[in-house]
Amino acid sequence: VVTPVPYGASPIFDEQSLPDALRNDHRTKAGTWGLLRMLEGEVRLVFVDPPSEQLVTPDRPAIIPPQATHHVVPLGPMTMQVEFYRERPELVEDADRG
């Protein structure tokens, strides 16, 4: 199994610098998968349709499917980054990109 490699990534955001665009409903474009990684702290990832929520922690990254409308709610101090893929990323529990 070949693990997809991200083609890009967001800046690293904290609870202060997280842009309003990510705090409000938005979505990735067609063909783009997101992988939300927490470096510290946690966020609530809220999907709109179908409605669901996921707690994202440093041990539990979250996959964001193409065109899935969602937003992020910081739960206290945190740092996070989103990686972007052209195919569904693999969740490897012990992956450490350094």
Question: Each predicted region: which residue ranges?
Answer:
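N-terminal first-folded block
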Residues: V2-T32
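Double-stranded beta-helix
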Residues: T3, A9-Q16, V82-G98
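Short, conserved beta-strand element in jelly-roll/cupin
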Residues: A30-L45
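Short hydrophobic/aromatic-rich beta-strand segments that constitute the beta-sheet cores
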Residues: L45-F47, V82
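Short acidic-glycine-tyrosine-enriched beta hairpin
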Residues: P50-Q67
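Ligand-binding loop in jelly-roll beta-barrel domains
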Residues: P66-E90
